[in-house]
């Protein structure tokens, strides 16, 4: 494919923005190529500025569950924007959106809208600390919860340790209040609570990890977290920014039948516009200002465009939508399994609803340590060929693929064929 216009655009961008992008993964560094600059999308397809067409499995990193430029969503947005983009005062649509979220998400009795997933997790941690009067948060290695200081933490040595900053600019004092253990390791969680339990305000977890690839919880893991946090008076916080309305009609918590105290949302609930939300038990949420003493505010929180995008996205999703995702996922998994076996390349495939992840290794992936063993050089080579074959994948081994209601069986078969062609070229 011809990428000449994208190459020129990136050459200009590196002098205008750090790394030439506004979010690091968009730089395509892990696949050793210049980023592809996109121009438009429709349905399951996305088109770059050179005119190349791709079947899109990035979907703006998850929000576009109805595909690109859904007619109902864009029609509602066109109407809404003519009424004004933001008012700094409540709107009736905020009520309708809140009612819809409360109806669909089992844990949420009250909800606060914000403007990003990072803002949602940041506020949820502040609320957990304010509600419990405790300081420490336990998170899992490889689970990404946005770029707030207390969550940009990785583990030191040992099973359960005080965290170390994962980015320059994160104070050590902040890191010391974050405990990190391996995802899916309930024994490590128990040990952490034995050591620090009197001061752990909450456990934050992606019910399906989505930023080390796609890594579902092992049997009993989420149930164990629910039991341990309840026993110690800590809050269980589900970060469903990615999994919310992607894993199931009632989010991951409905799918797995484990109800947290607080839930963070984003991505799908904005229909492609900037948005976030956090909610949970009424007695906890009433600690948020102006009802309570825990402060949180935002100029664009609940803005009418994001609420419009979210409301008209969620309104179109039905339980049957998720049956369709499962059908397409079954087809893709079977096809990839056959293709990689044909080429004698090891592959592990993980799925959760409309999220699919594959790893180029033989061992079943249950945490970041195992995910890191994937063949990154092979992934990078394959990525380039997949793009040349008209398939747009996330440009990182540690990001999952997303399906939309607009993907078709034909799209899936073309994708399977593209993997076959790509492996034929590079092996």
Swiss-Prot record:
InterPro entries: 4pyrrol_synth_GluAld_NH2Trfase, Aminotrans_3, Aminotrans_3_PPA_site, PyrdxlP-dep_Trfase, PyrdxlP-dep_Trfase_major, PyrdxlP-dep_Trfase_small. It catalyses: (S)-4-amino-5-oxopentanoate = 5-aminolevulinate. Keywords: Cytoplasm, Isomerase, Porphyrin biosynthesis, Pyridoxal phosphate. GO terms for biological process: protoporphyrinogen IX biosynthetic process. Pfam families: Aminotran_3. Its cofactor is pyridoxal 5'-phosphate. It is found in: Cytoplasm. Its EC number is 5.4.3.8. Pathway: Porphyrin-containing compound metabolism; protoporphyrin-IX biosynthesis; 5-aminolevulinate from L-glutamyl-tRNA(Glu): step 2/2. PROSITE patterns: AA_TRANSFER_CLASS_3. GO terms for molecular function: glutamate-1-semialdehyde 2,1-aminomutase activity; pyridoxal phosphate binding; transaminase activity. One of its GO terms (cellular component) is cytoplasm. Signal peptide: none annotated. It is an enzyme of class 5 (isomerase). Homodimer. HAMAP family: HemL_aminotrans_3. This is Glutamate-1-semialdehyde 2,1-aminomutase 1. The gene is hemL1.
């Amino acid at each position: 494919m011809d990428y000449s216009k994208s190459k020129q655009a990136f050459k200009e961008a590196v002098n205008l923005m750090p790394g030439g992008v506004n979010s690091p993964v968009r730089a395509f560094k892990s696949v050793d190529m210049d980023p592809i600059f996109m121009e438009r999308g429709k349905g399951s397809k996305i088109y770059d500025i050179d005119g190349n067409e791709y079947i899109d499995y990035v979907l703006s990193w998850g929000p576009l569950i109805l595909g690109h430029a859904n007619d109902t969503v864009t029609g509602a947005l066109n109407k809404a924007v003519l009424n004004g983009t933001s008012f700094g005062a409540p709107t009736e649509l905020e009520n309708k959106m809140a009612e819809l979220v409360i109806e669909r998400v089992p844990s949420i009795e009250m909800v606060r809208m914000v403007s990003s997933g990072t803002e949602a997790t940041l506020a949820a941690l502040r609320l957990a600390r304010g509600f419990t009067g405790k300081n420490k948060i336990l998170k899992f290695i490889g689970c990404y919860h946005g770029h707030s200081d207390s969550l940009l933490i990785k583990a030191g040595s040992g099973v359960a340790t005080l965290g170390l900053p994962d980015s320059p600019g994160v104070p050590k004092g902040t890191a010391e209040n974050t405990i990190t253990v391996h995802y899916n390791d309930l024994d490590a969680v128990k040990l952490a609570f034995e050591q620090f339990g009197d001061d752990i305000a909450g456990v934050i977890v992606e019910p399906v990890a989505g930023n080390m690839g796609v890594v579902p919880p092992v049997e009993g893991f989420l149930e164990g977290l629910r039991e341990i946090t309840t026993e110690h008076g800590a809050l269980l916080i589900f970060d469903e920014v990615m999994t919310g309305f992607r894993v199931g009609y009632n989010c991951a918590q409905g799918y797995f039948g484990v109800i947290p105290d607080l839930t963070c949302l984003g991505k799908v609930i904005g229909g492609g516009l900037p948005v976030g939300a956090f909610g949970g038990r009424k007695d906890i949420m009433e600690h948020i200002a102006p009802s309570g003493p825990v402060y949180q505010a935002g100029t664009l929180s609940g803005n009418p465009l994001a609420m419009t995008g979210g409301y008209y996205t969620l309104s179109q999703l039905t339980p049957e939508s998720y049956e369709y995702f499962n059908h397409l996922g079954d087809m893709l998994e079977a096809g990839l399994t056959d293709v990689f076996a044909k080429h004698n390349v090891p592959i592990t495939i993980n799925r959760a609803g409309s999220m699919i992840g594959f790893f180029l290794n033989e061992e079943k992936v249950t945490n970041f340590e195992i995910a890191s063993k994937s063949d990154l050089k092979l992934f990078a080579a394959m990525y380039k060929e997949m793009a040349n074959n008209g398939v747009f994948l996330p440009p990182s081994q540690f990001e999952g693929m997303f399906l939309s209601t607009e993907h078709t069986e034909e799209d899936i078969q073309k994708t399977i064929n593209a993997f076959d062609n790509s492996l034929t070229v590079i092996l």
